[in-house]
């Protein structure tokens, strides 16, 4: 039995669409087999297989019904005798040869231009500038904090997307919603964290920071300033027990013991920010030893506890603000005093700065005006001689406070230090004491 196609399918538009769809589908199958056999995780190849070619395939398939519809519509206006069969191409006719040549050259140029354009568009969408500046109003806090972070030389996509096509496609689908939210102004302020669909840290962080690496103890010096009249310095020097004292011991001791490959630490949190942890399980993968720890001060039934998500500790459970950290005022004022952008010769400048920075503002402009007004007023009321004779020093202090504020607080997006808990340490937030209570 021969396959008989409807008369409406016998038209140039449907024929071109079917040809495009067939060739594209063959390319997808071929490239998919190549990546499966070679186990290649190249993002560019994944883009072609999962994004670019399916788009071309869709267009080709779409042309088939469009051509059939147009031919059916055209045929209704003709008599049965006027209807024609399949188009005939005869290369003995010079017009046909010229038309075929033009079509071949034009198609080749179009496909090459499309390929180059798609590649460049992809390359731009993967750039730091695209991530940080395209949606400037929304992403300004993240982009600003990122530029001053230890990962400032690492591309956004290296952490947020990583290698491979699967997470690339997920990120673009997520990006479509973000474009929609920005367009309609429905982006939450501030952006909620932790991000539930963030790629696991073991697939991104550990590309550079692998657990098997030995991390020795680290000598750390911090400079603090008191809020007294002299802005007295208070220096702290301590040894951070990051790893074992001896490299031969590896990850048997220290803070990084939590990511020891021979140990699995799991926990359950009762809040979205993962700050309240009533249950922890320790498993020694070598010996099989298992210990469970329950916080009996948290009133929660066994049934409710069993329904909570069980997470395995990874980098992000402690280093939860590795690139987008918004420092508290006491911290960034200490840094500014150390650098000299805020003169420590001004009496009680830290106290005055913390007083004004404790307030909440609607806009950055409003904050800058309030800083200038209240610092001037503070010295006029409490230190009239300083206010009269050291106006330039006060102006420098005001500028330093404003600059530090703008790097860490973004009123338009309701972003400030106390919105995003930082689990490193236990100064402003409970951090380590979420589990070690």
What does each model-identified segment do?
Residues 308, 312, 316, 321-325:
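A conserved active-site cap/scaffold subdomain adjacent to cofactor or substrate pockets
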Residues 185-206, 353-371:
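Electron-transfer interface patches adjacent to heme c in soluble/periplasmic c-type cytochromes
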Residues 357-403:
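Long, charge-rich alpha-helical interaction segments
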Residues 293, 334, 340-375:
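Charged, amphipathic alpha-helical linkers/stalks
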Residues 36-58, 64-200, 218-307, 332-341, ...:
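Sequence context of c-type cytochrome heme-c attachment sites
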Residues 4-21, 51, 100-104:
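Alpha-helical transmembrane segments and their helix-start/interface "positive-inside/aromatic belt" motifs
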């Amino acid at each position: 039995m021969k396959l008989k196609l409807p008369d409406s399918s016998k038209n140039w538009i449907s024929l071109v669409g079917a040809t495009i769809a067939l060739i594209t589908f063959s390319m997808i199958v071929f490239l998919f087999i190549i990546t499966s056999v070679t186990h290649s995780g190249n993002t560019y190849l994944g883009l072609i297989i999962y994004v670019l070619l399916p788009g071309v395939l869709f267009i080709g398939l779409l042309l088939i019904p469009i051509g059939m519809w147009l031919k059916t519509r055209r045929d209704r206006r003709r008599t049965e005798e006027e209807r024609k069969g399949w188009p005939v191409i005869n290369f003995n006719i010079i017009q046909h040869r010229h038309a075929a040549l033009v079509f071949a050259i034009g198609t080749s140029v179009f496909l090459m231009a499309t390929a180059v354009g798609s590649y460049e568009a992809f390359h731009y969408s993967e750039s730091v500038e695209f991530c940080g500046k395209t949606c400037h109003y929304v992403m300004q806090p993240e982009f600003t904090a990122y530029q001053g972070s230890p990962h400032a030389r690492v591309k956004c996509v290296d952490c947020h997307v990583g290698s491979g096509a699967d997470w690339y496609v997920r990120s673009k689908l997520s990006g479509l919603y973000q474009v929609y939210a920005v367009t309609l102004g429905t982006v939450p302020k501030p952006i909620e964290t932790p991000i539930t669909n963030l790629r696991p840290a073991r697939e991104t962080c550990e590309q550079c920071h692998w657990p098997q690496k030995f991390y020795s103890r680290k000598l750390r010096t911090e400079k603090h300033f008191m809020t007294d009249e002299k802005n007295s310095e208070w220096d702290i020097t301590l040894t951070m027990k990051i790893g074992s004292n001896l490299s031969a011991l590896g990850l048997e001791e220290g803070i990084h013991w939590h990511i020891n490959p021979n140990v699995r630490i799991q926990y359950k949190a009762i809040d979205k920010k993962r700050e309240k942890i009533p249950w922890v399980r320790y498993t020694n993968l070598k010996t099989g030893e298992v210990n469970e720890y329950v916080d009996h001060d948290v009133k929660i039934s066994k049934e409710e506890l069993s329904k909570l998500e069980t997470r395995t500790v990874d980098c992000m459970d402690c280093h939860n603000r590795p690139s987008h950290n918004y420092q508290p005022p006491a911290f960034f004022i200490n840094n500014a005093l150390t650098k000299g952008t805020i003169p420590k010769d001004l009496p009680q400048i830290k106290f005055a700065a913390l007083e004004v920075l404790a307030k909440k503002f609607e806009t950055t402009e409003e904050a800058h005006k309030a800083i200038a007004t209240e610092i001037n007023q503070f010295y006029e009321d409490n230190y009239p001689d300083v206010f009269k004779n050291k106006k330039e020093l006060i102006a420098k202090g005001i500028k330093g406070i404003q600059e530090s504020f703008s790097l860490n607080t973004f009123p338009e997006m309701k972003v400030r230090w106390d919105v995003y808990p930082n689990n490193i340490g236990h100064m402003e937030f409970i951090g380590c004491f979420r589990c070690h209570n």
